């Protein structure tokens, strides 16, 4: 009698275990037949039952099913599109399931790349959507998840894109340490695919600026040198390194690199713009005559442009400011009065020249269409402010009034 009771108990236990195993099998079958609702119901039971929740297979199919729900939710052409609203949290659940499967799968018997790819792409797309609406913190959360997931999916290209977005989010959040965290590994890469190079131009420039702001001379040079090594075909790399050498006092090396950039771009369609960048290097080294010659050559090649006009205006304004600083350091002796008068005349001459170039720059932006004006709004604002300062310094108050009104209008629109 006892043997019969024991046999019955074991039989009952076996049926219970098999019933739970059948939940996984049922989920697999329903998934193959396209019944996502039934597959989800079956796998959810298996994921919480004691007998199947520690089985890697359970979590593999959970990840797969939730990925299919994601396919229905994100692809209007999906054969599962009628299930698009089946579970709005499909992405998080698919990710958690895949990670649980990875944890339990001691033999790497399950290929999770599809699940990770689907989840990673979803996080990435969400991060772009949030970034474009200005929600940088939530965009960062999603792009960070995307990078981690996509590294598991075997998609390094989209993982790099996600890391780039993470760094850009930190930049918009003014979190320099966050930028360094994400952009640092990108800077250290030795090979960059062509379609990612425009991103890397931004990465190198931003990292250079952060290190310069932090007065980290070693990393300023290292970042610029890495740029020239990894992307030697990009003249911007030589110009960035030239700027680094100016900053560290090596003016001869800076000029050498500026000349190299000029030679590399001489026969390119954008040569006039490159000349302005080269002129900026000469200006920083104190060779104002060569800088002016480069700006004017650029204007001759392309008369209707912003860069040469704003570049010349900025250089002249800086030279006027230097004269002003020298005036402020003088005393009240007769000799100082003579020097002050001479310096004031030189300052005013620079300001009057700057005014003409600033007017041309403003005229250029004003002639653009709405999109062009929006893109150059910051340039316009800076030109207007500089022009207004020129007028005030020269006591040209009537000329200042309409310029100040435009500045106020721009500032009001930004608030």
Task: Mark where each language-model region is.
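TPR alpha-solenoid repeat register
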Residues: 56-58, 155-156, 162, 196, ...
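Short coil/linker segments at helix-helix boundaries
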Residues: 65-133, 151-157, 191-192, 198, ...
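Residue-level recognition of tetratricopeptide repeat
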Residues: 53-55, 159, 193, 200, ...
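Structural register within alpha-helical repeat arrays
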Residues: 26, 62, 69, 119, ...
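Start-of-domain marker
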Residues: 20-74
């Amino acid at each position: 009698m006892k043997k019969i009771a024991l046999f019955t108990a074991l039989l009952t236990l076996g049926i219970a275990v098999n019933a739970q195993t059948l939940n996984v099998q049922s989920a697999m079958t329903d998934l193959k037949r396209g019944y996502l609702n039934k597959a989800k119901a079956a796998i959810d039971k298996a994921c919480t039952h004691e007998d199947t929740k520690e089985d890697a297979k359970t979590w593999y199919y959970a990840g797969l099913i939730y990925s299919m729900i994601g396919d229905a939710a994100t692809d209007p052409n999906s054969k599962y599109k009628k299930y698009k609203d089946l579970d709005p949290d499909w992405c998080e659940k698919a990710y958690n399931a895949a990670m649980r499967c990875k944890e339990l799968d001691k033999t790497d018997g399950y290929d999770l790349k599809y699940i990770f790819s689907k989840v990673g792409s979803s996080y990435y797309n969400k991060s772009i959507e949030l970034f474009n609406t200005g929600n940088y913190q939530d965009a960062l959360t999603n792009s960070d998840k995307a990078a981690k997931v996509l590294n598991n999916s075997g998609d390094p290209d989209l993982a790099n894109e996600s890391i780039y977005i993470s760094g850009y989010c930190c930049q918009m959040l003014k979190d320099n340490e966050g930028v360094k965290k994400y952009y640092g590994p990108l800077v250290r890469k030795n090979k960059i695919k062509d379609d990612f190079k425009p991103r890397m131009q931004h990465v190198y420039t931003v990292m250079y600026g952060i290190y310069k702001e932090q007065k980290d001379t070693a990393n300023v040079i290292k970042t610029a040198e890495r740029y020239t090594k990894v992307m030697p075909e990009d003249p911007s790399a030589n110009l960035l390194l030239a700027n680094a050498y100016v900053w560290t006092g090596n003016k001869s090396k800076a000029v050498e690199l500026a000349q190299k950039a000029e030679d590399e771009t001489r026969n390119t369609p954008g040569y006039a713009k490159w000349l302005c960048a080269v002129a900026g290097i000469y200006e920083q080294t104190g060779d104002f005559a060569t800088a002016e010659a480069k700006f004017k050559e650029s204007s001759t090649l392309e008369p209707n442009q912003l860069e040469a006009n704003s570049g010349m205006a900025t250089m002249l304004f800086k030279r006027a400011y230097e004269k002003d600083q020298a005036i402020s350091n003088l005393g009240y002796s007769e000799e100082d009065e003579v020097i002050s008068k001479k310096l004031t005349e030189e300052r005013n001459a620079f300001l009057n020249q700057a005014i003409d170039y600033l007017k041309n720059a403003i005229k250029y932006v004003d002639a653009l269409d709405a999109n062009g004006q929006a893109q150059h709004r910051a340039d316009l604002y800076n030109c207007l402010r500089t022009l207004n300062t020129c007028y005030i310094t020269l006591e040209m108050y009537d000329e200042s009034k309409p310029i100040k009104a435009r500045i106020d209008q721009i500032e009001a629109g930004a608030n």
